[in-house]
Structure formats: C-alpha cells, structure tokens
Amino acid sequence: MAGEDVGAPPDHLWVHQEGIYRDEYQRTWVAVVEEETSFLRARVQQIQVPLGDAARPSHLLTSQLPLMWQLYPEERYMDNNSRLWQIQHHLMVRGVQELLLKLLPDD
C-alpha cells in the first residue's frame, strides 16, 4: 500500500526490548522480521508502546535483528554488526510511520 513521504528517517534505532527500538527522540518503533528465501527484511513501525526495563544484550542473542541501526549514506542503515540494510521505503501507512529495511548481502 502506498503512503505519503514522511521526510528523513530516524538517525539511530537502539534496541530496548526484543522487537522494540527507541530513536533519538525517544519514540518507540516495533520491528518484525520478514524472512524471504534469499534475504531478510525488517518492517519497522513507529508505534507508541509502554516500555519496561531495557533488555540486556546477552538476552537478545537469538534475534535476527541487530541491537542498533545507524543511518548511513545512500538510503541505508548500518547495524552494530557492520551489516548494511537498504531502506526499501519510509512512508506513512494508515497513519503509522513505517520503514521497510532489507539486509544487503556481504560483498
């Protein structure tokens, strides 16, 4: 579903709990993994959720999602494992800001 452009995406997304991230403005983002046969995607939506205590990184080791994403040139994010994620879209979808990120293959 197409949506309207919402400007610049967040500069940073830090994991708070499994599947829940915070940006530099303390907004919460919910991330869901979408596995395809040959690649991994993350659908990340800016949804206000109550935050409990932050999870320890050691408790998140089984997640396919990174601990942190940082905005990188050319419409990409780099994660804490130095992997690049392409921004496939950054739109407002049904009133919710959404990023669709695709993990790029290692070169």
UniProtKB/Swiss-Prot annotation:
Single GO MF annotation: protein kinase binding
Tissues and organs where the protein is expressed, per its UniProt entry: Not found at a significant level in any tissue.
Family matches, as Gene3D superfamilies: TCL1/MTCP1
Source organism superkingdom: Eukaryota
The keyword Protein transport is annotated on this UniProt entry: no
InterPro entries in UniProt: TCL1_MTCP1 (IPR004832), TCL1_MTCP1_sf (IPR036672)
UniProt KW keywords: Chromosomal rearrangement, Proto-oncogene
Intrachain disulfide bonds: none
Biological process per Gene Ontology, one example term: intracellular signal transduction
Record has Transferase as a keyword: no
Pfam families linked: TCL1_MTCP1 (PF01840)
SUPFAM superfamilies registered for this protein in UniProt: Oncogene products
Subunit structure of this chain's protein: Interacts with AKT1 and AKT2 (via PH domain). Does not interact with AKT3.
Family (UniProt): Belongs to the TCL1 family.
Role of this protein: Enhances the phosphorylation and activation of AKT1 and AKT2.
Disorder association: Detected in T-cell leukemia bearing a t(X;14) translocation. Plays a key role in T-cell prolymphocytic leukemia.
Protein name (Swiss-Prot/TrEMBL): Protein p13 MTCP-1
Organism: Homo sapiens
